[in-house]
């Protein structure tokens, strides 16, 4: 367990978390702006959850030697990944069992003091419908891939949560 503990407390582990989230955000923006796939409001919320994981990775990269910062990073990682998984599962349900009575809103419901869709419309303004399935890879939809991504984040969290929060041994 000491090798896992050292890895979980290392800058490399947090950098990998950060880079995977950056990769997901880059893919989302590529799909939106290059492939011209319109994101729905649930996609925008998932994008925000990935930004939470990205921020957790950044906190871990900067403060991997400090237990409090590792704790904050792990907490944000867990909350963001769990929220993202919940959203992805809801979107899969909307897409596999579309109902005229269950639709998503046209605008995201951000707090009044933080209207991200107005400040950064090219990133946070939804233009698509939740029931549309604009892209698949290997017969798996984008929302199903996000279930895989957020589940992987949660599994990795469980694997690393205990060693990441242990005190750092100073030599």
UniProtKB/Swiss-Prot annotation:
Mode of membrane association: Multi-pass membrane protein
This protein's record includes keyword Transferase: no
Location within or outside the cell: Cell inner membrane
Segments on the Periplasmic side according to the record's topology features: 31-48, 90-144
InterPro entries documented for this protein: DiS_bond_form_DsbB/BdbC, Disulphide_bond_form_DsbB, DsbB, DsbB-like_sf
Record-annotated membrane-spanning stretches: 14-30, 49-64, 72-89, 145-163
Keywords of this entry: Cell inner membrane, Cell membrane, Chaperone, Disulfide bond, Electron transport, Membrane, Oxidoreductase, Redox-active center, Transmembrane, Transmembrane helix, Transport
Cysteine pairs bridged by disulfides in the record: 40-43, 104-130
Similarity field: Belongs to the DsbB family.
Function: Required for disulfide bond formation in some periplasmic proteins. Acts by oxidizing the DsbA protein.
NCBIfam families: PRK01749.1 (NF002485)
Name assigned to this protein: Disulfide bond formation protein B
Organism this protein belongs to: Shewanella loihica (strain ATCC BAA-1088 / PV-4)
């Amino acid at each position: 367990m000491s090798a896992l503990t050292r890895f979980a407390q290392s800058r490399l582990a947090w950098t990998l978390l950060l880079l995977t989230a950056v990769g997901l955000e880059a893919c989302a923006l590529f799909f939106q702006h290059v492939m011209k796939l319109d994101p729905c409001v649930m996609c925008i919320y998932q994008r925000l959850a990935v930004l939470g994981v990205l921020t957790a990775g950044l906190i871990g990269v900067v403060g991997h030697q400090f237990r409090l910062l590792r704790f904050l990073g792990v907490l944000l990682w867990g909350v963001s990944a769990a929220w993202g998984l919940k959203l992805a599962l809801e979107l899969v349900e909307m897409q596999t069992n579309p109902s005229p009575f269950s639709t998503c809103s046209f605008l995201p419901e951000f707090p009044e003091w933080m209207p991200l869709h107005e400040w950064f419309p090219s990133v946070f303004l939804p233009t698509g419908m939740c029931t549309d399935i604009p892209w698949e890879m290997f017969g798996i939809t984008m929302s199903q891939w996000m279930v895989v991504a957020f589940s992987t984040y949660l599994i990795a969290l469980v694997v690393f949560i205990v060693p990441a929060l242990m005190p750092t041994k100073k030599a």
